[in-house]
Design a protein with these regions (language model features):
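Short secondary-structure transition hinges
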Residues: 101-140
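Helix-turn-helix
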Residues: 11-15, 19, 23-57, 61
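Amphipathic alpha-helical segments that line or abut small-molecule/effector binding pockets
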Residues: 64, 89-104, 158, 162, ...
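Amphipathic alpha-helical linker/stalk segments
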Residues: 18, 64-93
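Amphipathic, non-transmembrane alpha-helical scaffold segments
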Residues: 59, 63, 67, 92, ...
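Short amphipathic alpha-helical elements of helix-turn-helix/winged-helix folds
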Residues: 19-23, 98, 102, 167
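Hydrophobic/aromatic-rich alpha-helical bundle segments in the mid-to-C-terminal region
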Residues: 110-114, 125, 129, 147-193, ...
Length: 217
């Protein structure tokens, strides 16, 4: 049976995105050519432009899709945590575990989302950055709730949120399935570290750590 034009177009667009992810992750955005992408997809170069007007538009689509999917996945999977039915500490634990699980399952998307921000045009950069802020604000809201109810000791919500996200996302640079630690073990240990970051008063502990380093060995 012949495929409809619509379904064929959607399948082609999906193949373009999948091949673009592989090529950009392995070669870099600047090095990837639309001709090379067309060859990987198995279409003529002109066919690419029926789906994406420019190479820049394709990159923006990949990064916007990654952030939208991330936001949707959190809202769908952990809607009960978002609605305040759980304590802030439980929501923070759920957020940390979700972030790890989602990101290690999509290493190419994560790599491109962070390493190719510099390749976006100003308009696309601002659009992607707005979605990133939406996600960051989810974590900030959890941290603020914990401060308000007295369960967290945090001097700077923004700084702590950025530190947590950097630590959690950094897992994708070294984690590989089949390694020494399972995904569940990584989730558990990193969630515990995130919890300590929120519960401990990091601001007050820094001078103590500095003094400890100055002691003669």
């Amino acid at each position: 049976m012949a495929r409809t034009i619509g379904s064929n177009g959607e399948e082609t667009a999906a193949r373009i995105r999948a091949c673009a992810l592989e090529l950009i992750a392995s070669q870099g955005f600047e090095a990837m050519s639309m001709r090379g992408l067309a060859a990987a997809v198995g279409v003529q170069s002109a066919a690419l432009y029926h789906h994406f007007a420019t190479k820049q538009a394709l990159l923006a689509d990949l990064m916007m899709s990654h952030m939208r999917d991330l936001l949707t996945a959190w809202q769908t999977t952990f809607a009960d945590h978002m609605e305040g039915h759980a304590a802030a500490s439980d929501r923070l634990d759920a957020f940390a575990r979700f972030h790890i699980r989602y990101h290690i399952s999509r290493p190419q998307e994560v790599f491109i989302a962070y390493m190719e921000l510099r390749s976006l045009s100003p308009v696309h950069y601002n659009a992607v950055s707005e979605l990133r802020r939406d996600y960051e604000n989810l974590l900030k809201a959890i941290l603020q709730d914990g401060v308000d109810d007295g369960s967290f000791q945090i001097d700077d919500i923004h700084l702590t949120a950025m530190a947590i996200l950097a630590m959690l996302t950094g897992i994708t640079t070294w984690y590989r399935p089949g390694g020494r630690l399972s995904a569940s073990a990584v989730e558990m240990q990193y969630a515990a570290m995130v919890r300590r970051m929120a519960v401990d008063d990091i601001g007050e502990s820094l001078p103590v750590q500095k003094q400890a380093k100055q002691r003669p060995g």
